[in-house]
Amino acid sequence: EVKLVESGGGLVQPGGSLRLSCATSGFTFSDFYMEWVRQSPGKRLEWIAASRNKANDYTTEYSASVKGRFIVSRDTSQSILYLQMNALRAEDTAIYYCARYYGSSYWYFDVWGAGTTVTVSS
């Protein structure tokens, strides 16, 4: 069974930092692109970060809203995806999800975690 389990959310003051984790199991972690997506209150899902697969050297990509503040990384030995979030702002308040990105004839997020909640407030 393929599983993604996020953790690390919480309440943090503006300007603070958090590190989210996404523990994965049931598939070959290195073969897949892995993504972070968030949903702020009352807003649509927003893609924020990608970690490409081993074949693409685990290169990363970020949305403009988090670039320079957030860092996505992997622990390939433990099959964990991370999101280091720095210089947090009130607008970063959201539920954060990790998702597996799957490609065949087209690309889509085929497995999601349940999410972890981040609240940025003083």
Curated annotation (Swiss-Prot):
Keywords: Adaptive immunity, Immunity, Immunoglobulin. It comes from the Eukaryota. Residues 1-114 form the Ig-like domain. Transmembrane segments: none annotated. The keyword Ion transport does not apply. GO terms for cellular component: extracellular region; immunoglobulin complex. One of its GO terms (molecular function) is antigen binding. InterPro entries: Ig-like_dom, Ig-like_dom_sf, Ig-like_fold, Ig_sub, Ig_V-set, IgHV. One of its GO terms (biological process) is immunoglobulin mediated immune response. This chain was isolated from a myeloma protein that binds phosphorylcholine. This is Ig heavy chain V region M511. It comes from Mus musculus.
